[in-house]
Amino acid sequence: MSPTIFREGSFRFFFFSREESRMHVHVSHPDGEAKFWLTPALALATSAGLSPKQIKEAENIVAVHLEEIDYAWRTHFPG
């Protein structure tokens, strides 16, 4: 299961229900995908198919929505 947190432009932001416990978010785009760590600081974990410009755009969107992503994570993974 991979609940969508939100969509913005051509990006979809989501996480997988049965994955590691360190807070992170996955990003999909028609051109590729990326994963960003949210703790201890926002950082790119992996990417495939996205241009540097698309990665930066996704990272900026994640930064703007950090509180929303954090809330979704803590709601989905209580405790």
Question: Which positions does each model-derived feature cover?
Answer:
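Negatively charged, low-complexity tracts enriched in Asp/Glu with abundant Ser/Thr
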Residues: 1-11
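Generic preference for hydrophobic/aromatic residues in regular secondary structure cores
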Residues: 5, 43-47, 65
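C-terminal structural segments of small proteins and small subunits
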Residues: 49-79
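Alpha-helical structural elements
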Residues: 6-8, 24, 68, 72
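A short, structured beta-strand/loop element
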Residues: 14-50
